Amino acid sequence: MELLKALLLLSGVFGALAEFCVIPRIDSQLVEKLGQRLLPWMDRLSSEQLNPSVFVGLRLSSMQAGTKEDLYLHSLKIHYQQCLLRSTSSDDNSSCQPKLSGGSLALYLLALRANCEFFGSRKGDRLISQLKWFLEDEKKAIGHNHEGHPNTNYYQYGLSILALCVHQKRLHDSVVGKLLYAVEHDYFTYQGHVSVDTEAMAGLALTCLERFNFNSDLRPRITMAIETVREKILKSQAPEGYFGNIYSTPLALQMLMTSPASGVGLGTACIKAGTSLLLSLQDGAFQNPLMISQLLPILNHKTYLDLIFPDCQASRVMLVPAVEDPVHISEVISVTLKVASALSPYEQTFFVFAGSSLEDVLKLAQDGGGFTYGTQASLSGPYLTSVLGKDAGDREYWQLLRAPDTPLLQGIADYKPQDGETIELRLVRW
């Protein structure tokens, strides 16, 4: 009895000191609508549209898609295994290169863990080796004195470390050290703004390493870096409640949910963030499958670290397709497209149906002549690679802005311009 009293006393003391990140419960119908938006994407099985994050998000949610999930994972396995085989032959594997490096391969490894799969075959060893080679190449690009940059970005670097850690694969201290150095020296700040999703991904990766006590010689730095990431995320909270922006908030919450903290207002911050997410869900802000897949876990009080010991027998509600709303005749709106950072400045107004995407506007402009653009597929949707014949160079990208200077938070396939808006495409460095 005395021991029980002592334990209760200790739990009371620690409970008073440490706060947990918990968000308010979201209405189950709103959550179900999110899951329903993923169902059509699970029917898209082409190599360009397969997205491991969709599978991971659904497996960490409170919902399931039945046989669709099995078929989707089967399609993922076939595609990645074929790409892996081609990478060792002389076949043209240009379409596979993005799949076998960085974020995409890391997400595929997370998808396998979400299905409770452990690596015990040569194919598994080759996948692990492929991702380790990617990190080695990125480490070399960063350089011994940290004067360079990853060939991709630190988000993919952190995600790759996380995926390997979840599979309980160790990495050399020098690889982990690059991520630690980046956290310690504010490398995730671009144009004066903290990249919250990059901070969060680094925090998740480092927390995984800490839990396994990997890279024990770096333990003090890892612990300090996790605290630094948490502090930066909390400081990034806007008055509206989100961290950075509404789309970086789910990953930020995943990181904050991984461990309690004291004296930083963690509980209050997470409640505010959860409230902002609720409002955004009611407004229909989450349409992109990648963003939805990052949001679903936290609505089920899960994070990517739950993939360390996944529960593949957990009861999940079966999703049914949403009933489509009757088609209404849309009004016609005007949208002006502007490009200033080009040899020949461009500005033209187009008339499109309300609800059209920015990509629809770009296609209309190109079909009309005098305007050209190029895109590349990614897990978050197509992104601009060239405008009016001008390709984005090294450490450059085509930024989307609502005039005069408001950056868009969505990509060309997701953003729906409003009547009278001017959308500027601006080439910027990062």
UniProtKB/Swiss-Prot annotation:
Main localization category: secreted
Binding site for cob(II)alamin: 152-156, 193-197, 245, 248, 294, 398-400
Subcellular compartments: Secreted
Keyword terms of this UniProt record: Cobalt, Cobalt transport, Disulfide bond, Ion transport, Metal-binding, Secreted, Signal, Transport
Outcome when changing residue 102 to E: In strain: NZB
GO molecular function, a single term: molecular carrier activity
Residues making up the signal peptide according to the UniProt record: 1-18
A GO cellular-component term linked to this record: extracellular space
GO BP term, example: cobalt ion transport
Disulphide bridges: 21-270, 116-312, 165-208
PROSITE patterns from the UniProt entry: COBALAMIN_BINDING (PS00468)
Superkingdom of the source species: Eukaryota
Subunit structure: Interacts with CD320 (via LDL-receptor class A domains).
Recorded family membership: Belongs to the eukaryotic cobalamin transport proteins family.
The name this protein goes by in its record: Transcobalamin-2
Species in which this protein is naturally found: Mus musculus (Mouse)
